[in-house]
């Protein structure tokens, strides 16, 4: 399958991003002559990985985990989070991460009736979820959560407020007719 065969009405764009408890805004304002004060942890702990699927309605299938994405983690995401959202005829579009090519994960997606489309190598510009992750990281910097629970709560809040207009625009921006 090629990118031209992606139907934005049926597509789930999959990817991962990482965050930590030290995310804060890069810039701030303060009254003239005063410095901005902010507490920022030096030891920011483990990376929190966010695995998600973007479609025209938003980010319906999101999971967070401490650490990176392994085959086992991706398999659990597919089984418990992604597959319940899929319908026969849907398309799962993802990059060439080794975990994405796991046979058991692919079998679960195909058993749900969805088709798998792999992006060309080194082409994040074809994956609109990259724009969603950029938006999420700005959200997390504003939230400035300082605990893993705080980060997870901020992510959950972001998923509730994202709406459907932004995902539609991100998908259109990546040259998929939406």
Predicted regions, residues:
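C-terminal anion-handling pockets and recognition modules
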Residues: 7-11, 129-178
């Amino acid at each position: 399958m090629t990118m031209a065969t992606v139907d934005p009405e049926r597509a789930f764009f999959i990817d991962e991003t990482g965050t930590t408890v030290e995310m804060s805004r890069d810039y701030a304002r303060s009254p003239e002559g005063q410095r901005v004060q902010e507490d920022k942890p030096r030891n920011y702990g483990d990376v929190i990985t966010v695995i998600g699927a973007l479609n025209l309605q938003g980010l319906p299938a999101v999971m967070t985990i401490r650490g990176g994405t392994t085959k086992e983690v991706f398999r659990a995401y597919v089984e418990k989070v992604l597959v319940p959202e899929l319908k026969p005829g849907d398309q799962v579009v993802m990059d060439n991460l080794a975990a994405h090519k796991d046979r058991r994960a692919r079998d679960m997606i195909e058993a749900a009736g969805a088709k798998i489309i792999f992006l060309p190598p080194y082409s994040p510009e074809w994956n609109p979820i990259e724009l969603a992750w950029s938006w999420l990281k700005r959200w997390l910097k504003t939230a400035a959560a300082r605990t893993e629970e705080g980060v997870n709560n901020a992510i959950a809040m972001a998923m509730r407020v994202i709406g459907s207009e932004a995902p539609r625009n991100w998908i259109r921006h990546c040259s998929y007719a939406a």
